[in-house]
Amino acid sequence: MKTVSIIGGTGYTGSELLGILANHKDVEVKNVTSRKDSGKKLTKIHPQVKNLKNYNELEFKNLNPENIDTDIVFCATPHGASLKIVPILHEMGINVIDLSGDYRFEDLEMYEAWYGLKHTGKINSVYGLPEIYREKIKKANVIANPGCYPTGAILSMAPLVSNDIVEERIIFDSKSGVSGAGVEATETTHFPNVNENLGPYKLTKHRHSPEIGKELEYLAEKSLKVSFTPHLLPVTRGILTTAHAFLKEDIGRADIVEIYEEFYKNEFFVRIYDEEMISLTGVRSSNFCDIGGFEIDRFGRIVVVSAIDNLVKGASGQAIQNMNILMGFDEKEGLNIGGLRP
């Protein structure tokens, strides 16, 4: 039985980690940290996990990284905080899965430009998208868990850019549930403002844009012009991404579907739908990424749609999938559940 610590355990990703790990047979949560809630019972902040595993016995702790002695650490901290924590854990030889954006970029200047933070320096991290980097994840010590929007976007276009059958310009239109904004309420996420409403934000300047771009360029082995615009939906969970690209050659829809099925044939958590329409309820509370659409218009524009749960495949579920790969567990352990539909 391996032991786990969750640093920053009061937010939505920390909550989701606890819920999934409650059904994981190979690990036990030993520490959950929080500065502001130190000393409080875990189940006071997360009542939904009461009576599960050892959670009734746990209290939030205010631990320094040097005092953590578990096999695995999940950093569910805001951007910037991991820069002070991960290097210490890395030096100690502890396996780290970081859910922030702090170690997703090899180009530190790009990180600093988009996140507005001074980086403290590179460490040997691996970008934790299992469908692309599984072999590297197996040997990693620090795994940079992908962002929620990038997960759905990259997976939706990876087969096309890898096979070099679309032009360099790709556009992503994504719509996310409110939980993606985090546990702290804001003017934007306040119920009267988000209910029965839909609107875009950060039209051209969302920090996930370069993350999507760099990963697709890695697959394409060339420069791409990737554009991304997010929207906020009046729902709790889920990201629906509509991807647009232009085909380089005349290719039929059936051939496109075959390319996707071949690319993801060994990927349990990616489901390809030929005719069914993709929706959020199909993936809600699951670690699946559903991909469909594959429609081609008269101008050669192909439209691909993906759906994920932003808190699961877009965050905590993918982090646990990465842990499973890293530790040699069954990759599906704790995650073998379908979407909650309806």
UniProtKB/Swiss-Prot annotation:
Family of the protein in this entry: Belongs to the NAGSA dehydrogenase family. Type 1 subfamily.
Keywords, sorted A to Z: Amino-acid biosynthesis, Arginine biosynthesis, Cytoplasm, NADP, Oxidoreductase
Entry function: Catalyzes the NADPH-dependent reduction of N-acetyl-5-glutamyl phosphate to yield N-acetyl-L-glutamate 5-semialdehyde.
Enzyme nomenclature, EC number: 1.2.1.38
One GO MF term: N-acetyl-gamma-glutamyl-phosphate reductase activity
PROSITE patterns assigned: ARGC
Pathway assigned in UniProt: Amino-acid biosynthesis; L-arginine biosynthesis; N(2)-acetyl-L-ornithine from L-glutamate: step 3/4
Catalytic activity: N-acetyl-L-glutamate 5-semialdehyde + phosphate + NADP(+) = N-acetyl-L-glutamyl 5-phosphate + NADPH + H(+)
Cell location: Cytoplasm
NCBIfam families noted in UniProt: argC
PANTHER family referenced in this protein's UniProt entry, alphabetically: N-ACETYL-GAMMA-GLUTAMYL-PHOSPHATE REDUCTASE, CHLOROPLASTIC-RELATED, N-ACETYL-GAMMA-GLUTAMYL-PHOSPHATE REDUCTASE, CHLOROPLASTIC-RELATED-RELATED
Name this protein carries in UniProt: N-acetyl-gamma-glutamyl-phosphate reductase
Main location group: cytoplasm
Annotated active site: C148
GO biological process entries: L-arginine biosynthetic process
GO CC field: cytoplasm
